Design a protein with these regions (language model features):
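Acidic, serine/threonine/proline-rich low-complexity intrinsically disordered regions
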Residues: 141-150
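Short amphipathic alpha-helical coiled-coil/interface segments
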Residues: 152-164
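Residue position in alpha-helical solenoids
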Residues: 139-142, 166
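Short beta-alpha connecting loops at secondary-structure transitions
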Residues: 111-120, 141, 180-186
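An acidic- and aromatic-residue-enriched active-site/binding cleft used to recognize and process polar
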Residues: 28, 38, 77, 101-102, ...
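Extended ligand-binding clefts on enzyme/binding-domain cores
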Residues: 1, 5-10, 162-216
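Aromatic-rich carbohydrate-recognition surfaces in CAZymes
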Residues: 1-109, 118-140, 153, 193-196, ...
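Short amphipathic alpha-helical segments with heptad-repeat character
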Residues: 150-153, 177
Length: 216
């Protein structure tokens, strides 16, 4: 559910929103969003999640959609558009929470880096998850819901601590590991390890990891 960037969003807001609306309409009742939602090959997905590619969800589709909606609000100041998608936003967050395995506070599952199999606890999505929580906090502030703000802040602190403890090896974020932190793959330096850091800074939400670690 990737936007074509700041220019596309800023100057073609309605076109950008039409894409976000399509992904929202194709959201499964469980809260996940598919990569190929229907319009990619054969036609539009229908409202309520009926699409030709059932059950092909990826974690970062939900995260990307959430982040884009908040970025739209911050670019336009349109609270009503954000509120119109609030039910879907909460459903997508509930889905992401459901993907947390026992002993972990970071969702586990496939992502759009789908060309080969990745470790369960994956440095790319760990950072994106932290940015998703930054976005959820911004949603709470935008609509005046302190419970969302508090939930997002507490979850961010917990998940960030876990990511640093399990994935940071003193030089870079390891490719990934098992949910309990075992079998950490320090022999692979994955180029997408700071994707969440980039997204958060681009959106103006600050760092998801300490800057001394990022610069390492």
């Amino acid at each position: 559910a990737a936007s074509w960037g700041a220019f596309y969003q800023k100057f073609f807001t309605q076109l950008d929103r039409s894409e976000m609306d399509i992904f929202a309409d194709a959201m499964d009742p469980e809260g996940y969003i598919l990569h190929f939602i229907g319009h990619y090959y054969v036609g539009m997905g229908t409202v309520g999640g009926r699409v030709p590619t059932e059950k092909g969800w990826m974690l970062d589709n939900a995260s990307g959609w959430i982040i884009q909606l908040v970025k739209d609000y911050e670019q336009t100041g349109d609270t009503e558009y954000l509120k119109a998608h609030l039910t879907g936003l909460k459903r997508a967050m509930k889905f992401l929470y459901s993907r947390m395995p026992q002993g972990s506070t970071i969702p586990v599952g496939p992502t759009t880096y789908d060309d080969f199999t990745h470790p369960p606890l994956y440095s790319y999505y760990a950072g994106v998850w932290l940015t998703t929580l930054k976005a959820y906090e911004a949603i709470g502030k935008a609509i005046g819901d302190e419970s969302i703000v508090k939930q997002a802040q507490q979850q961010f602190a917990t998940s960030q601590k876990e990511a640093l403890e399990k994935l940071w090896n003193g030089r870079f974020f390891a490719y990934g590991c098992e949910p309990d932190g075992s079998k950490r793959l320090d022999n692979v330096l994955f180029t997408g390890q700071l994707a969440g850091q980039f997204l958060s800074r681009y959106c103006g939400w600050g760092d998801v990891y300490p800057m001394d670690i990022v610069k390492a």
